[in-house]
């Protein structure tokens, strides 16, 4: 089992798909990494040699921000917005949509489950 960036990659999947299990690596980045290292897109993780896994690990460590570092960066960016008390920061703080979506209806993902209001029947 290949372990890259603290993530155990599934051995029976193709390399491109398995790399997307790492937070911060999508399909495009996975294809770019495979092309850079000359790894065939159809190869399975279990067919990779230890040297190839090491190459992938070194490439990801050198060129990409992944997993914990990426999560930390994202959290720090949101915290910075909240500390600035700018509009986006206030929306984050209140748990409302940040990017201008409507909230009169919908927005249930950010607002949570609907709370009934007494005497609101028509």
Swiss-Prot record:
Disulfide bonds: none annotated. It comes from the Bacteria. Coiled coil: none annotated. Keywords: Ribonucleoprotein, Ribosomal protein, RNA-binding, rRNA-binding, tRNA-binding. Pfam families: Ribosomal_S13 (PF00416). Residues 95-122 are annotated as: Disordered. GO terms for molecular function: rRNA binding; structural constituent of ribosome; tRNA binding. One of its GO terms (cellular component) is cytosol. GO terms for biological process: translation. Transmembrane segments: none annotated. SUPFAM superfamilies: S13-like H2TH domain. NCBIfam families: uS13_bact. Located at the top of the head of the 30S subunit, it contacts several helices of the 16S rRNA. In the 70S ribosome it contacts the 23S rRNA (bridge B1a) and protein L5 of the 50S subunit (bridge B1b), connecting the 2 subunits; these bridges are implicated in subunit movement. Contacts the tRNAs in the A and P-sites. Belongs to the universal ribosomal protein uS13 family. Part of the 30S ribosomal subunit. Forms a loose heterodimer with protein S19. Forms two bridges to the 50S subunit in the 70S ribosome. HAMAP family: Ribosomal_uS13 (MF_01315). This is Small ribosomal subunit protein uS13. It comes from Sphingopyxis alaskensis (strain DSM 13593 / LMG 18877 / RB2256).
């Amino acid at each position: 089992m290949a372990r890259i960036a603290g993530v155990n990659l599934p051995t029976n999947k193709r390399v491109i798909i398995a790399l997307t299990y790492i937070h911060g690596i999508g399909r495009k980045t996975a294809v770019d990494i495979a092309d850079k290292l000359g790894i065939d897109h159809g190869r399975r993780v279990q067919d990779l040699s230890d040297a190839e896994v090491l190459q992938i690990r070194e490439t990801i460590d050198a060129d990409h921000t992944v997993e914990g570092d990426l999560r930390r960066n994202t959290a720090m960016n949101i915290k910075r917005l909240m500390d600035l008390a700018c509009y986006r920061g206030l929306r984050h703080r209140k748990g409302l949509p940040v990017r201008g979506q409507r909230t009169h209806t919908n927005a249930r993902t950010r607002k949570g489950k609907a709370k009934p209001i007494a005497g609101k029947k028509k």
